[in-house]
Swiss-Prot record:
Its EC number is 3.6.1.40. It comes from Escherichia coli O7:K1 (strain IAI39 / ExPEC). Pathway: Purine metabolism; ppGpp biosynthesis; ppGpp from GTP: step 2/2. Catalyzes the conversion of pppGpp to ppGpp. Guanosine pentaphosphate (pppGpp) is a cytoplasmic signaling molecule which together with ppGpp controls the 'stringent response', an adaptive process that allows bacteria to respond to amino acid starvation, resulting in the coordinated regulation of numerous cellular activities. It holds the Pfam family Ppx-GppA_III. The gene is gppA. It catalyses: guanosine 3'-diphosphate 5'-triphosphate + H2O = guanosine 3',5'-bis(diphosphate) + phosphate + H(+). This is Guanosine-5'-triphosphate,3'-diphosphate pyrophosphatase. The lineage of its organism: Bacteria, Pseudomonadati, Pseudomonadota, Gammaproteobacteria, Enterobacterales. One of its GO terms (molecular function) is guanosine-5'-triphosphate,3'-diphosphate diphosphatase activity. Keywords: Hydrolase.
Length: 494
């Protein structure tokens, strides 16, 4: 039997769903082994006196019996079970918890809203890339957490009494998706937010990250509809109009919205619109992890790395035995090219980061086979867990690696939605050229080059006589010029 001492479990008894995460510690990082989620909708079982109904408690216990089976193999000191908003509120929470502990065979801790917010922030800090100074938003079933912080350190923590289940029962009880129900839900949410808005704004943020089912649902809708993954107020308003158009909750149909998420989607959407409006949020992306990841990393006592993406790339390079020196060499050439065309092409810093990440992983396909290495690389990157990269960024990396050599598949570059299609094409061109000029695998054999962009025309200037002295190099560059010309990317080499 394999060792179980490296296994850890985190269980979150939420107001809408119960979740279990089982992971294995591998070289200072975590590998997910099991994720189980059950819609228990505990908050829906609270009556006006805040007593949980027997039916709701039974749904919860039934779910925990499933979880208990998986926990038998894990040391009790490596299991954490926490309960959140509904069990903070319920007057008979003690009855539920006593039986829950009996079923699971380990303690269940009811955590405060502030502790929940802190753990959510830790989960985000360990798993989400981007700028250091962030605002984290988590809309749960009965509470919403809002946290600001820098790096691993929180600067303000709030847990507010509103959630997608309680707002559903309160403002969409008639299952009618009319404008007036949305207005009432948003107005109430803004009223709850108002007392904390000033302090959140005072601490400020460079990026806003969402870590809940509502945000996950939005991400799935946007991916299904081919939009980019950034959540904006404009997109939220469009989705609200779509919901209003559907008329009733049971008739709610939006491309990419699963049946499972549909019930609490309008109420979560109303809360999110209120948050965007009240805090003047420009855009939000999906977090890589939240409460359960915060619990796991807390048990492991792992420090938050400054750059999650770098840690991920290092781990993948080690695991697939990628030649790190060569990856760095290609990255250096690509960065040099990027810096020379950045202003002409109006490229953003995130595009540079993603290009460098593609360089770091470009030879991963060789770990499968030289034949079809780009296809293997794309498959691996698309399917690996890459903390710090969003789903759309993973798709872009996979697409760049698929097109690192050979004829270009333009449609694949247009099907990703992390960056505009034109930017994906530009990054692809730079990656392909960087790989060619670093192919001798020695720093002293990379020529001094200048690259100029004039609209779509790239002009590459090499040292005098270089093409004559390097007949194989010339042949490869001629072939590359031809491949780029097939997709209307003009490339001149002197």
């Amino acid at each position: 039997m394999g060792s179980t001492s490296s296994l850890y479990a985190a269980i979150d008894l939420g107001s809408n769903s119960f979740h279990m995460l089982v992971v294995r510690e591998v070289a200072g990082s975590i590998q997910t082994l099991t994720r189980i989620k059950r819609k228990v909708r505990l908050a829906a079982g609270l009556n006006s006196e805040n007593a949980l109904s027997n039916e709701a408690m039974e749904r919860g216990w039934q779910c925990l019996r499933l979880f208990a089976e998986r926990l038998q193999d894990i040391p009790p000191s490596q299991i954490r079970v926490v309960a959140t908003a509904t069990l903070r509120l319920a007057v008979n929470a003690g009855d539920f918890i006593a039986k829950a502990q009996e079923i699971l065979g380990c303690p269940v801790q009811v955590i405060s809203g502030e502790e929940e917010a802190r753990l959510i922030y830790q989960g985000v800090a360990h798993t989400t890339g981007g700028a250091d100074q962030r605002l984290v938003v988590d809309i749960g079933g009965a509470s919403t957490e809002l946290v600001t912080g820098t790096g691993a350190q929180t600067t303000s923590l709030f847990s507010l009494s509103m959630g997608c289940v309680t707002w559903l029962e309160r403002y969409f009880a008639d299952r009618n998706l009319g404008q007036e129900n949305f207005d009432a839900a948003e107005k109430a949410a803004r009223k709850v937010l108002r007392p904390v808005a000033d302090e959140l704004r005072y601490h400020g943020w460079k990026v806003c990250v969402g870590a809940s089912g509502t945000v996950q649902a939005l991400q799935e809708i946007m991916m299904a509809q081919g939009m980019d993954e950034r959540i904006t107020l404009e997109k939220l308003q469009q989705l609200k109009q779509r919901a209003i158009h559907c008329g009733r909750l049971e008739e709610l149909e939006i491309d990419g919205l699963t049946l499972e998420r549909a019930l609490v989607f309008p109420s979560g959407l109303a809360i999110l619109i209120a948050i965007f409006t009240e805090l003047n949020i420009q855009c939000m992306t999906l977090a890589g992890g939240a409460l359960r990841e915060g619990l796991v990393y807390g048990m492991l006592h792992l420090a938050v790395e400054q750059d999650i993406r770098s840690r991920t790339l290092r781990n993948i390079q080690r695991r697939f035995m990628i030649d790190i020196d060569q990856a760095q060499r290609v990255a250096k050439v690509a960065a040099n090219f990027f810096d020379q065309v950045e202003s002409e092409w109006h490229l953003e810093a995130i595009s540079r980061d993603l290009l460098i990440s593609a360089c770091q992983l470009h030879e991963i396909g060789l770990s499968v086979d030289f034949k079809q290495a780009p296809q293997h690389a794309a498959y691996l990157v698309r399917n690996l867990d890459l903390p710090g990269f969003t789903p759309a960024q993973k798709k872009l990396l996979a697409t760049l690696l698929l097109n690192q050599t050979n004829p270009v598949d333009l449609s694949s570059l247009h099907q990703q939605n992390a960056v505009p299609p034109r930017v994906a094409e530009q990054l692809c061109r730079l990656l392909r050229l960087a790989i060619i000029f670093a192919s001798r695998r020695r720093d002293d054999l990379v020529p001094e080059m200048t690259l100029q962009a004039n609209h779509e025309l790239l002009t590459l200037t090499l040292p005098q006589g270089w093409l004559t002295q390097h007949p194989l190099g010339k042949e490869i560059i001629d072939q590359e010029s031809q491949w780029q010309s097939y997709v209307h990317w003009p490339l001149e080499v002197h």
